[in-house]
């Protein structure tokens, strides 16, 4: 009875066998495809660098555009203020004509608008003469029309763009260095002599014999 129980237990403990099968094509591709995968990784890295470079350039263009619009708006405001000052400071001219039977008389009245005297701008009256007043008015009209200074570029963006371009140039230089030795070897080979036919060789040998005789 004990022996039968042991036999039954041994039969129950058996497990199904595992069979491992290898795909020869995939195995060969894995063993021989190291160079191929390396080239693919390089291509992917170059494409990623190009995409990052495009994004940085796009950001830089947008920032420049925003700065240009801001500077243009400030300049337009300054020009509008200068036009208003010119309109207030300009001279007021009136002319009246009187017709007579023998001649015509024209009476012209010119009156300058003194902003400092009327305290329209809140300025104190100047102590000097008319020459000083005209110089001050000219300087006040010229100051708002000066060109505004440009803002400096973002140094972080320029550094990123320069680093990305340097990495791209390094990849291109490696490719050029690998291609040059083959050209040098091809250039060192001596030129091959042109092939001649049997009839040409016979003619040449016949001429040599006649010249020897």
From Swiss-Prot:
Which residues does the annotated region (Disordered) include? 118-213
The consequence of residue 21 to A is: Loss of DNA damage response pathway activation
- Sorted alphabetically, which InterPro entries does this protein's record hold? Nucleolar_protein_12 (IPR019186)
Report any Pfam family annotated for this entry.
Answer: Nop25
At the top level, the lineage of the source is Eukaryota
Q: Which UniProt keywords apply?
A: Coiled coil, Cytoplasm, Nucleus, RNA-binding, rRNA-binding
Q: List the subcellular locations.
A: Nucleus, Nucleolus; Nucleus; Cytoplasm
Q: Where is the composition biased (Basic residues)?
A: 170-182, 198-213
Q: Does the keyword Coiled coil apply?
A: yes
Coiled-coil regions, chain positions = 33-96
- Give the molecular function GO annotations: identical protein binding; RNA binding; rRNA binding; single-stranded DNA binding
GO cellular component, alphabetical, reads: cytoplasm; nucleolus
| Family label | Belongs to the RRP17 family.
This chain's function reads: Multifunctional RNA binding protein that plays a role in RNA metabolism and DNA maintenance. Participates in the resolution of DNA stress and the maintenance of genome integrity by localizing to sites of DNA insults. Also plays a role in proper nucleolar organization by limiting nucleolar size and regulating nucleolar number. Mechanistically, regulates the nucleolar levels of fibrillarin and nucleolin, two key players in pre-rRNA processing and ribosome assembly.
- What does the annotation say about its assembly with partners? Interacts with KIAA1191.
Which PANTHER family does the UniProt entry name for this protein?
NUCLEOLAR PROTEIN 12
Protein's recorded name: Nucleolar protein 12
């Amino acid at each position: 009875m004990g022996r039968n129980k042991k036999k039954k237990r041994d039969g129950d403990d058996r497990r199904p066998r595992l069979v491992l099968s290898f795909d020869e094509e995939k195995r060969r591709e894995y063993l021989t495809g190291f160079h191929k995968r390396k080239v693919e990784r390089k291509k992917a890295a170059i494409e990623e660098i190009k995409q990052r470079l495009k994004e940085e350039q796009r950001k830089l263009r947008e920032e420049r555009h925003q700065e240009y619009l801001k500077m243009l708006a400030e300049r337009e405001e300054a020009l509008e203020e200068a036009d208003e000052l010119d309109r207030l400071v300009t001279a007021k001219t009136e002319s009246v004509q009187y017709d007579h039977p023998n001649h015509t008389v024209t009476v012209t009245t010119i009156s300058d608008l003194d902003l400092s005297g009327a305290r329209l701008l809140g300025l104190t009256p100047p102590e000097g003469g008319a020459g000083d007043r005209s110089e001050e008015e000219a300087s006040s009209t010229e100051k708002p029309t000066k060109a505004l200074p440009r803002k400096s570029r973002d140094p972080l963006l320029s550094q990123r763009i320069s680093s990305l371009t340097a990495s791209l140039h390094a990849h291109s230089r490696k490719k050029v260095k690998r291609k040059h030795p083959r050209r040098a070897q091809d250039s060192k080979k001596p030129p091959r002599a042109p092939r001649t036919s049997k009839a040409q060789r016979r003619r040449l040998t016949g001429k040599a014999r006649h010249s020897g005789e």
